[in-house]
């Protein structure tokens, strides 16, 4: 018979499992929000806000033909409620239109940027909750807690959750999609097909990269499930399963397409090629997919390890992950994923195999296919999977320390190693604060700009710190080499002169890392001098006395 104390203990545990993940996610959101005041807008934020407002205000989708609208709508809703509007004669440039909104609205720049960034927090909440429930279903509550804690203490996740960008939103919806994909592969019921279609539609409505991420993951999961069932089904059962999977996949695909089209709103547009009016989403979704294909086919200026290249490098993301991931997660996550995959194969359990298989598949795809090498943010979707491996390895080490057959020294060593790595991971929350976006691990050394720059180190985020430091030093005039999307004429800067590449001057000089590394060595002459100060993580301040 179960006593009252046991019942109360169990009910308390269930309450903790029910509300604990939400509390953890809210704490992560508060931590992210506490960094907003430090940073001005990063490069992509004005255009995302302008694109969202254009859809809300005017029912058209005019800026940047590579991204669907869901994340942008979330960012634009707060500013729109605060009175921000797309100007009637808005600029054809999304960056300029976004600047006009941020700097020339009735609400202040800080208010609008804060409200826009707040629109990203629901996606961080969703990411934490989807991670926790997916892992709990496969591995239990202890693993769910550990993996979610590892994920929410990852600087790259926190940094990109703190700005208006689409990478955390698509990561959150892809993790939800992975979970629902796995459930669907195990049993493609009507209910699960509908849930999968909704999740996939929302993910693709956020960023086009969700298409290959979810499609490849589904193929790998389905192949693994078929291999596990090989020889266990009769020919009649195989035919029945094919029909179930085919029907479920078709239903999910139709639902996903409908949701993607609906995300662009109810407006109809005339398409000359077919001579009729269609929903805006039919036209725009096609343009978004083609835009990404065109961008990838033609490349993007990129920097890695002292070199610049238009088409990138197959190993770019391997290097980025090596220096932008916490060392504890690297040491635990990769072996943990391998161990889970091996254990799943032996036990013939799909759920244990999925994280490692999906991680390897998506990493290989990004390395071999992507020619847009502008930051680890494009593979943020790998971090939830790596966090599962890290949680599994840490838990296995701790459980080994409790095994009665283990020797005392082995127990102590395993327990100490697990504790040190977990505490090291969590300590990063303090040591990296508030610069989660520009954080690098110890492998990068003292000069991470020699390895990566764009959006990993310098995304234009430190301009506010620069203006504060120049005011503190009472510097009367500067030469400025800065690449970002802020309106410099509206920032609190002293009089400045743009510093062109190869223009050797004296006096106070401001140089950001993006200008240094992506200007064809035009500012390398400054490397002969010691900067007075590194402002934030991405701007150097020099003083060269008159000759």
Residue ranges and their predicted role:
Residues 22-24, 215-219, 253, 341, ...:
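Signature aromatic-anchored transmembrane alpha helix within multi-pass, membrane-resident enzymes
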Residues 4-7, 441-547:
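C-terminal luminal/periplasmic domains and tails of membrane-associated envelope-modifying transferases
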Residues 147-152, 159, 179, 200, ...:
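Short helix- or helix-capping micro-motifs
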Residues 118-138, 176:
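Transmembrane-helix motifs of polytopic, lipid-linked glycan transferases
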Residues 177-193:
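Membrane-interface transmembrane helices that cradle and orient dolichyl/undecaprenyl
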Residues 320, 325-348:
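Hydrophobic, aromatic-rich transmembrane alpha-helices
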Residues 286-289, 295-304, 417-468, 484-488:
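Membrane-proximal, lumen/periplasm-facing interface regions of secretory-pathway glyco-
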Residues 61-119, 271-310:
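Interfacial juxtamembrane loops and adjacent helix segments
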